[in-house]
Amino acid sequence: MEEMKVTKFPEGFLWGSASAAYQIEGGWREDGKGITNWDQFVRIPGKTYKATTGDVAVDHYHRYKEDIALMAEMGLKTYRFSVSWARIYPEGRGEVNPKGIEFYENIIDECLKYGIEPMVTIYHWDLPQALVDLYGGWESEEIIEDYVNYAKTLFKAYGSKVKYWITFNEQNIFTSLGWLTAQHPPGKFDDQKTFYQVNHHVFMAHAKAVLAYREMGGTGKIGASFAYTPSYALDCKPENVMSKHDYDELKNFWWMDVYAYGRYPKAAMNYLRKKGFAPVVTKDDQKILKAAAAEIDFMGVNYYQSCVCEYNPMDGVTPYGTMNTTGVKGSAQVLGVPGIYKNPGNPYLMTTDWDWSIDPVGLRYCCREITSRYDLPIIISENGLGAFDKKTEDHKIHDEYRIDYLREHLKELGKAIEEGCEVLAYCTWSFTDLLSWLNGYQKRYGFVYVDREEEEGATLDRYKKDSFYWYQDVIKQDGENPVSYTHLTLP
């Protein structure tokens, strides 16, 4: 395709930013909220950076009006946030907590007051611990009906005000880190059989929630958000090209095909059957998945990096090794699946301090792949740069590196739209700084700096970074040729 300038984004394009309940709210035991799996997991020694918790987080629970006013000042068109299941149902089921319903209604109303479209994520990893204690959480198919009941409660409470619903955030990530690497709850290691069955339970919960939304007369848009890591073959050696294909089958299409087609990729399922890892899928399940696939309105994409695929011999690297959770650049190990693929670094790309490749073209690749394979509209539900931001003595945060990162990604997203991809929204991760699940508060993503570190007791005051003013300008210009940092006018 020929080189092009970035023209204005489509009329009605939703310029947004995102967050997650556990990472920002705090108020972990206030107003009747139940305990979540994360409230318990972070209290296990060694599980989080410097034993950080979300007990207070960045105190959005008490400061949401201040935060949403800043969003309005920036000019956001949409705010993507998640609901904490345990705030609505403290025990995961049973009695609804009216204070929980009221809190999220207040957030929705505050957004609408400023003309900001609320985009609601139903599940962003924080599960009522009561359901884990009762039947094992996602390991039991019993959770499907509890999740659907919870989702229906949200549809009933907020359906007249919310037009965009995301059933699950990054199903591929919370299940992988929970049942394969033990880095997320329930902290299980290499439990592949359970991992795939858990994923099937999540798929069924997603599908039944989508169908319930339609049965209840929901006319908004609904789908799931997937952490998409596009892959490149190391070279044109056939073994490496096949490793890329196998990677996509097992790491990308295994999820997206179910959302969009209602079926699992055949080659991946055959492989899992041979290994004894394939989930139990009934004919009724297949019908429900297929019916829901016909009802989703978009594919949500959380994009941070791409990867390289190379054939991995049987005695090669495994999926389990050191992941960089400290920000010490170069500490991550090459991982892979013996006999299939490994993911070496890309010599053509820079990396973040957490060893994530920086690849703006990869975002365009994602959009093109989804458009060609699924012919679905796209919501970029997360994209952003985690970095060590520093506040100067006069309370300025000069994050030109974040501006450069987002600017280059938006240029490629604009090209994807010019090439025929239907993109509805772009949500950065994140609006304010927040708790990074494994990296504490040192890994900052926001346009708004929050005065806190790993230790409690800071002011939690908010300060606008340089990137705040840059994104404000992008929104005013509807994304047309976003300016570089050197051309940015700062107050």
Spell out what each predicted region is.
Residues 18-20, 82-86:
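Acidic/polar N-terminal loop/beta-strand segments that form early-domain functional surfaces
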Residues 85-96:
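Glycine-rich, proline-tolerant flexible connector loops at the mouths of alpha/beta enzymes
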Residues 2-48, 91-93, 101-484:
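Active-site region of glycoside hydrolase catalytic domains
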Residues 63-83:
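Catalytic domains of carbohydrate-active enzymes, especially glycoside hydrolases
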Residues 485-491:
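Conserved small/polar residues in nucleotide/adenosyl-binding loops
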Residues 35-69:
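Aromatic- and Gly/Pro-rich amphipathic surface segment
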